[in-house]
């Protein structure tokens, strides 16, 4: 099976696996324990925080580890909203966010917060004017993902930072699909989230960063771990492996960019010959991501045919694909249900070979030839 679903998850690299096994074997203590074994684990945790902080140019005091980016989104957004609710209860996001973000805002609506969904253009992008038109006197937080997992569109977060600072509004971003692959304006953010398994790290580990200068309130009371941000013993082997994955992604970024750009242009050239539509922004996008529609074919059909031919692709974000309903992002960008049903996603990585990619291109050509339907 040729794997082309890197936006859903990525394989752990050999280096990351080695780090995980080594730390799991040698540093198995509870970092909250007061004996030497616990101290060794705690020391690994603090070393990892410092290493990540150096790579991302953030304060290690604001780093918290969670069980996933989904959990990190919930805890970060809720903790910030609770801490600032006396100032206001108005929150802003978009309908193009990851399901974990959308469900978090639905939860906050049930807790008497008021949520506005800023409109996006046909590429899923937010304009400064649209955002400014949504801000109110009681707005306390804006959450906009840096890159959209279904469409692949990258948001120009830096253009929002200045007006949000002017109005003293917190700025959160889900950077799960971006960090390690493209540049992210982290210094413009008050908080961000990311995931281990999206950058060739382990599953079951996410990261939340909240600027230590920003007040937050624990979602659960009485929690002693990680300053009360998240309950439970920190998984030190996963933290170490996650750190190694971030480190590796930064070290190999130039080689990654060259490889991904080559495959990107190769596929885009071929697309010009096909009855195919690229969703999301044509240029300001993740280069390893293609959100596509083939005229006259359902995405589910394309995905199943690809699977039968030995290629793993998807019909959208894996966190919502089991619901068998179009992602709300399609309604947000003005697509009909029929158009949304045509969607499928191809995403590749550093391990994807040119030979594998050419084989997938040949598969799509054969599929289109069988259909024989003009644009």
Curated annotation (Swiss-Prot):
Its cofactor is pyridoxal 5'-phosphate. It is an enzyme of class 2 (transferase). Keywords: Iron, Iron-sulfur, Metal-binding, Pyridoxal phosphate, Transferase. Its EC number is 2.8.1.7. Catalyzes the removal of elemental sulfur from cysteine to produce alanine. Belongs to the class-V pyridoxal-phosphate-dependent aminotransferase family. NifS/IscS subfamily. This is Putative cysteine desulfurase NifS. It comes from Halalkalibacterium halodurans (strain ATCC BAA-125 / DSM 18197 / FERM 7344 / JCM 9153 / C-125).
């Amino acid at each position: 099976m040729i794997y082309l679903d890197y936006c859903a998850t990525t394989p752990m690299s050999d280096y990351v696996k080695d780090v995980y096994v080594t730390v799991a074997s040698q540093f198995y203590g509870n970092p909250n324990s007061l004996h030497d074994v616990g101290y060794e684990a705690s020391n690994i945790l603090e070393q990892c925080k410092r290493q990540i902080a150096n790579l991302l140019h953030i304060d290690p005091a604001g780093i918290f580890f969670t069980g996933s980016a989904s959990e990190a989104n919930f805890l970060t957004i809720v903790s910030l909203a609770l801490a600032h609710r006396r100032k206001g209860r108005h929150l802003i996001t978009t309908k193009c966010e990851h399901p974990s973000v959308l469900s978090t805002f639905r939860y906050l609506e049930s807790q008497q917060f008021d949520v506005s969904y800023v409109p996006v253009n046909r590429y899923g992008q937010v304009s400064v004017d649209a955002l400014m038109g949504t801000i109110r006197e009681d707005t306390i937080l804006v959450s906009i993902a840096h890159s959209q997992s279904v469409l692949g569109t990258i948001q120009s977060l830096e253009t929002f930072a200045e007006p949000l600072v002017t109005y003293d509004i917190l700025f959160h971003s889900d950077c799960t699909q971006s960090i390690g692959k493209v540049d992210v304006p982290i210094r413009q953010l008050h908080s961000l989230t990311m995931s281990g398994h999206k950058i060739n790290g382990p599953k079951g580990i996410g990261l939340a960063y909240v600027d230590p200068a920003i007040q937050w309130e624990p979602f659960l009371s009485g929690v002693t771990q990680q300053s009360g941000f998240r309950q439970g013993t920190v998984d030190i082997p996963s933290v170490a492996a996650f750190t190694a994955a971030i480190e590796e992604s930064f070290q190999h970024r130039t080689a990654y960019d060259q490889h991904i750009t080559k495959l990107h242009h190769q596929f885009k050239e071929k697309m010009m010959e096909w009855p195919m539509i690229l969703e999301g922004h044509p240029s300001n996008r993740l280069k390893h991501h293609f959100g596509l529609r083939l005229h006259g074919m359902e995405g589910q059909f394309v995905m199943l045919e690809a699977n039968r031919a030995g290629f793993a692709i998807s019909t959208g974000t894996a966190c919502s694909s089991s619901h068998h309903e179009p992602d709300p992002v399609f309604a947000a960008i003005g697509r009909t249900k029929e158009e949304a049903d045509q969607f499928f996603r191809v995403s590749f990585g550093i391990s994807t070979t040119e030979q594998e990619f050419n084989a997938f291109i040949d598969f799509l050509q054969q599929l289109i030839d069988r259909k024989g339907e003009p644009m």
